[in-house]
């Protein structure tokens, strides 16, 4: 108990100095952080990797996703902590056990904020999968200890001058490309929102005939995501939908909202979308509020399209997963 209180006080002082809204989030969560524990997740997939799968995604919670593309296994922004940054307790435990994962090829980190980069989660993964590659944007290395992972640092593409596309690497036949994200690097509040340190990115993951977009944290941009959608033929887009106070605005500060996520989905021209970055943590209102708004927007859009005779519906292409749920999008075709 004492250690939790000390952590909270230290982080509160730090966030107060930063002048950012995180101090209010911390204050509103302090009671839960000190006096409560997250609920246990209802179900976990015990055998997440299957040889017959071409593309699957398992939503672990918040922004953490386990991807299988053919024989390759990737973790995106893995954060399995119950308490994040000392001031935020998860609603429920991360919907995944490392012991249930038989292999891991790559870990992709979008930026160093504490709800996306967990030092302890990476240490746990390192114990079992030290040969995995750790991929991150330039600037994030400042916050990484000396893991045994092979580090792969990518230049970001967060500007019009860079055509919204950053560096890329081919790793074990998987091409990873950094793409535009309108957010911040840094880790502790002051370095992010005052000094505006670089070090954030989205990703395009290409392997064989499958392409996946992962947005990390980002606000909306009416040119960048159109450009990405023109350049890549995206099968699946993992798009954040929160946090947001007014989720029918396009963006707030440095996060896309539920409405903005639909605009991103349209711009990217992706076949399917999974919404992420909601549900696990409380950001000054109901953590599921972005999802409620998204569902309402989907229903309104589909009703309008039906009246106009348009068959292409969001409800058929946007897959809303429970934490711990895995969706298989395609299976490998077995030829007789």
Regions found by a protein language model. Give the residues of each.
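Bacterial N-terminal signal peptides
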Residues: 8-17
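Pre-active-site segment of Zn-dependent metallo-hydrolases
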Residues: 39-49, 60, 69-112, 119-127, ...
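Beta-strand-turn-beta hairpins that frame and shape the catalytic cleft
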Residues: 50-55, 68-74, 167-177, 206-212
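Active-site metal-binding loops of divalent metal-dependent hydrolases
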Residues: 63, 78-81, 111-112, 139-140, ...
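Active-site HxH/HxHxD metal-binding segment of metal-dependent hydrolases
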Residues: 95-167, 182-185
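Cap/insert and terminal regions of metallo-dependent hydrolase folds
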Residues: 106, 133-135, 139, 219-322
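Active-site-proximal loop/helix segment associated with metal-binding centers of metalloenzymes
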Residues: 175-207, 232, 236-238
